[in-house]
């Protein structure tokens, strides 16, 4: 049974994520203990709320350093919702700019849709060769609830680095990043733990990669 550390930094629906992971066969510990986080097979970083507040909470438990240490060693990390957003360079919400973890270039900004938050079920354009979306049909829907996102992707591969796999979604005129697969670091803007059977399959796919 794979062991997953669910990072407790004062943000995110921890119990919902814990139950979802346990249902697909993971052994889960809710923790911010560095020893437990670094030893786990996988680290899941949830996130609900404002970008700046989440980053402050993350730094208060040295979560940003733990994420960096795991990734430096090629150890799997997955972010959900704001847990995905904070992996980018920066975020700007309510006029407050904050630095993120800097794992990916890009800025989290408010969507331009008339109806916000983008809340409910939506399809995604899964990246070719995606491992997270393996076994899921193109018309599969996932549960979103957010008003901010990343609308521009600036990380292209070259001869030395492989470009991450980027999955997109559309809400009104906004096209935004719905998921990223970048070696050991993966993340989703939607909530797999609230996405029924489809979300369970995606989490199972991630667990199988650990």
UniProtKB/Swiss-Prot annotation:
Catalytic site positions: 81 (nucleophile), 191, 193
PROSITE patterns: GATASE_TYPE_1
Pfam families recorded: GATase (PF00117)
GO biological process, one term: L-histidine biosynthetic process
InterPro entries associated with the record: Class_I_gatase-like (IPR029062), GATASE (IPR017926), Imidazole-glycPsynth_HisH (IPR010139)
Alphabetically ordered keywords of this record: Amino-acid biosynthesis, Cytoplasm, Glutamine amidotransferase, Histidine biosynthesis, Hydrolase, Lyase
Swiss-Prot/TrEMBL catalytic activity: 5-[(5-phospho-1-deoxy-D-ribulos-1-ylimino)methylamino]-1-(5-phospho-beta-D-ribosyl)imidazole-4-carboxamide + L-glutamine = D-erythro-1-(imidazol-4-yl)glycerol 3-phosphate + 5-amino-1-(5-phospho-beta-D-ribosyl)imidazole-4-carboxamide + L-glutamate + H(+); L-glutamine + H2O = L-glutamate + NH4(+)
Protein's UniProt keywords contain Cytoplasm: yes
Any one GO CC term of the record: cytoplasm
UniProt entry tagged with the keyword Lyase: yes
Domain annotation Glutamine amidotransferase type-1: ranges: 3-210
Involved pathway(s): Amino-acid biosynthesis; L-histidine biosynthesis; L-histidine from 5-phospho-alpha-D-ribose 1-diphosphate: step 5/9
Assembly with partners or alone: Heterodimer of HisH and HisF.
Its biological purpose: IGPS catalyzes the conversion of PRFAR and glutamine to IGP, AICAR and glutamate. The HisH subunit catalyzes the hydrolysis of glutamine to glutamate and ammonia as part of the synthesis of IGP and AICAR. The resulting ammonia molecule is channeled to the active site of HisF.
Name assigned to this protein: Imidazole glycerol phosphate synthase subunit HisH
Originating species: Corynebacterium diphtheriae (strain ATCC 700971 / NCTC 13129 / Biotype gravis)
């Amino acid at each position: 049974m794979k062991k997953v550390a669910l990072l407790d930094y004062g943000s995110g629906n921890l119990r919902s994520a814990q139950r979802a992971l346990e249902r697909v066969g993971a052994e889960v510990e809710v923790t911010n203990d560095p020893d437990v986080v670094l030893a786990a097979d996988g680290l899941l970083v949830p996130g609900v709320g404002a970008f700046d507040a989440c980053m402050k909470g993350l730094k208060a438990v040295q979560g940003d350093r733990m994420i960096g240490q795991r990734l430096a060693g090629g150890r799997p990390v997955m972010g959900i919702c704001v847990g995905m957003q904070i992996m980018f360079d920066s975020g700007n919400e309510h006029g407050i700019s904050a630095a993120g973890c800097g794992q990916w270039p890009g800025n989290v900004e408010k969507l331009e849709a008339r109806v916000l938050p983008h809340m409910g079920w939506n399809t995604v354009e899964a990246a070719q060769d995606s491992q997270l979306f393996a076994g899921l049909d193109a018309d599969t829907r996932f549960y979103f609830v957010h008003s901010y996102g990343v609308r521009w992707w600036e990380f292209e591969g070259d001869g030395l680095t492989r470009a991450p796999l980027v999955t997109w979604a559309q809400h009104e005129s906004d096209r935004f990043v719905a998921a990223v697969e970048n070696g050991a670091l993966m993340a989703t803007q939607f909530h797999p733990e609230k996405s029924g059977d489809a979300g369970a399959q995606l989490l199972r796919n991630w667990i199988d990669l650990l």
